[in-house]
Amino acid sequence: MKRITAICIALLLLAAAFGCRNAAANTYTTAAGISDAAEQPAGDTPAEEKPEQPAEQPAEGQNTTEEDPTVQNPIATITMKDGGVMKLELYPDVAPNTVKNFISLANSGFYDGLTFHRIIAGFMIQGGDPAGNGSGGPDYCIKGEFASNGFNNPLSHKRGVISMARTPMPDSAGSQFFIMHADGDFLDGQYAAFGMLTEGYTVLDKIAMSKTDSADAPLEPVVIDTIRVETFGVEFGEPEVIR
């Protein structure tokens, strides 16, 4: 029963609205009855432990695009205001439009100065909201690239995986993303996972252990200085969006 409760809480906590018109009626900040979410962790996570990558996930810099085996996957660098750095390999073969969207936002400076506004130790850290409270976004949405929305996405929500937050509507993701602090396989097929942390697990752990209030908001702002994505000369173009 505890696991079922935790799953329901987790799904609600990840929901947020990001600016496209159809999502506006489903804004979630703090849902009633889930203030104890931090007491429902997805699993224990040792501070220095780095997870095994699922078979579907390539190693850093390894391309999985059949068309050109010489092309490297893009690498995102999240630099925190306090100097901490996290690097993630993005998988355009797994969630192509989601990756395009993240690259476009990051390299335009959209994420610069934003925060991780929702933090749950043993579950995930969530950021990328210009409103800072789970209700903001880039004034558009993108199609949800995950199994329950008719898209084959084999990437499992293991510790270190980055995925897109959304409202209960499947095509409502915009700019908000979350990074798993612990394994959360129960999210598989429901959210668009699109990359994996390759460096900076100690930074992830530090952020996840931030003191938070009853709404899982950090007591002190956890500020992103910049997010930039190295594409190694590959042009990904702009994402397909829903307005």
Model regions and ranges:
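Cyclophilin-like peptidyl-prolyl cis-trans isomerases
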Residues: 8, 16-243
